[in-house]
Amino acid sequence: NDEGHMAKNQWVSAENEISYDSPDSPDGGSWLYFGKDGKIVTAKWMSINGKTYYFDEDGLMQTGLLELDGQTYYLGEEDDGARKTGWILLETITKDTDDEDIWCYFDTEGRLIVNQMDRKIDNGYYTFIDGKMQTGWVLMPSKSDVTDSNAASPRITDYQYYGAAGDGKRAEGFRSIEGLSGIHAADEVYTFYFKAGKPYVSDKKGNSLFTINAKKYAFSDLGIMQTGRQIANVANDEIANFYFGEDGIVKTGKQTIYNEETGETENWFFHTDGDKKGQGYHGLRDGILYVYGKRQDATADQRYAPADL
């Protein structure tokens, strides 16, 4: 330095040779660091007062994004230099306003997570593509290598859901959200149920039954939770009538259902237990005839009316 003393464990400005004794750290400009042997630290990582810095071959402290040995690191802004870990908003790194709500994650060694599916971070799972945390409906990488020219129609089973912008946590349980472009109607909100990010989807055309927390629900082949009176697939490749509440839970026993097509209120009965629980009752019950769940009533001027069983 100017006084002729050997600099040890000191930051020194590359521009004006101002020196700082540790534990002070640099504040703007280009900085060098002299180790305990009085030599400039070059081409290596250096831990200084609990923070990690990287110095290039000329000994200059690096800032911003650093590409090194096939890995990407973030060393803060020009007045910082300390290696970062954890969540970093991409806009902070690039200064690009188009990167709003896009997050990156740097592991405990400061390495950017580039392409990884369902990485566990704290209490959630996240997917990263090209270093960016994914949100919303995400086509899984194993499915996305099919080119547009030979790709079949998109299927909801090729996707997982990762929360809204700024969230990114893999979905679990019920979510009322917009559907998938090209699969569902635009701007419509539907209710789905997710397990490990994947929606419950009927594996047959139409609706199929699923048990969630000991309750029965029906989901379509597009993954949509069903409400009201619906037809669903049952065992032996058969179908049956069911009635679901607004919460999607199957209803049993006597039910009064409004028929929007006829404008009339109808009386139905659905099995209350057993393997057929929830299915429309077919046959005589307490002297009343039900056909696939719907009560059959003769008109006011009839004592008897034909019914097909």
Located regions from the model:
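Extracellular adhesion/carbohydrate-binding repeat motifs centered on closely spaced tryptophans
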Residues: N1-L309
